[in-house]
């Protein structure tokens, strides 16, 4: 059940919407709750529009949009990996919108907007890689991984977590990245071999790096900004970008087709693309992604996408609903069904 943050709960969060608040917005959010809340608060402060917030992982939110297609309850979907947003647009669950602020964005954010004919836009980006607990590695005399192939080393057996790709956009990007780098059959052979080293497939994409920070597992396949955030919070966490190259996420935003509060949805969309909104919310949430607006500087300690070896990720192909369903079904048959 999603956590809901609405106007009536404002007193518990230490803030309140202006007494002149007009209108409302139902915000679906697939970032972490620690980031969703500042986004909701910031928009209420700026506009006086009352926000009701529902938070779920990207895959779970896509499933909810499909279930609500005939009677949409949300207005805007913010955050989470871009592939499910692309799939939602392809399925007619979201609708096109053009903000004058599109021109202020990095090319990768604009490219996603163009590719989907305006149905989704990038709001942040991050690189896929590994997180690891430095204290656990030392205690167990394990090396830090540097490459994808390192994950198959026998000493890592039972030491790695990766999210479940059926619910996690992060884990789906792992599959899509490996398919693009290795070819589909070799990628699935890699995933089958990796399965023996996986100790859990949690539903959330951030759960593996949280487990690393808590010392519950030695390694995770995660976005490197999440590892950097855990380190900044004082946990013994390091990260690495795979030496062979890697994929990346474009955290996205979409207006839900048939939104009941369309004017508020469009106003939120325009506001959320501003440098001020992105800087304030990311700082409050202590997030280290690269933000879409070019005027937002890279935060100290944030991984720099410009220095990573990033593949030419095919968002059109791997965001397509049919391709997504096919790859997930293959993962279920050939990997998820295997004993551990």
List where the protein language model places each region.
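Short beta-strand->loop
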Residues: 95-104, 120, 149, 235-247, ...
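Extracytoplasmic ligand-binding site segments that recognize negatively charged/polar headgroups
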Residues: 30-34, 73-216
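Early extracytoplasmic/lumenal segment of secretory-pathway proteins
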Residues: 22-87
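Mature extracytoplasmic/periplasmic domains
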Residues: 256-315
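Conserved C-terminal helix/tail region of periplasmic/extracytoplasmic solute-binding proteins
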Residues: 313-340
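Periplasmic-binding protein-like
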Residues: 126, 189-195, 199-202, 233-257, ...
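A ligand-binding cleft/hinge motif common to bilobed small-molecule-binding domains
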Residues: 83-87, 213, 218-236
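A bilobed periplasmic-binding-protein/Venus flytrap-type ligand-binding module shared by bacterial periplasmic
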Residues: 131-136, 176, 249-262, 280-283
